[in-house]
Amino acid sequence: MPPGGVTPIEKSDLLPGTLDMLILKIVTLGPIHGYGISQRLRQISKDVLLVQQGSLYPALHRLEKRGWLAAEWGESENGRQAKFYKLSAKGKQQLRKEESNWNRLAGAVANILQTAE
């Protein structure tokens, strides 16, 4: 359990499509390889979101196949070959749509939680 006693959320606990949106958002920060994406998700979420390789890499391949990510082989910080992902124009459009839908959903859930007391 991470500091603060917060239980990590595994990919299986996320709403469908959430991992794709989070990956697209992380990649807006600049070209990054898969391991870097998982680490950045963990760091930014303060150890709440933990994405295993078995979930991350199929998602990256799916996003690349849809044309939302572009990938290029390069050298990682430890000198190994790694596939670096960056957001495509189509991916930017999709991310805007996903963020809008997420904000609408989060607002609806917040409204229910506030009134159901």
Name the predicted role of every residue range.
Residues 2-5, 90-117:
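Amphipathic alpha-helical dimerization/coiled-coil segments
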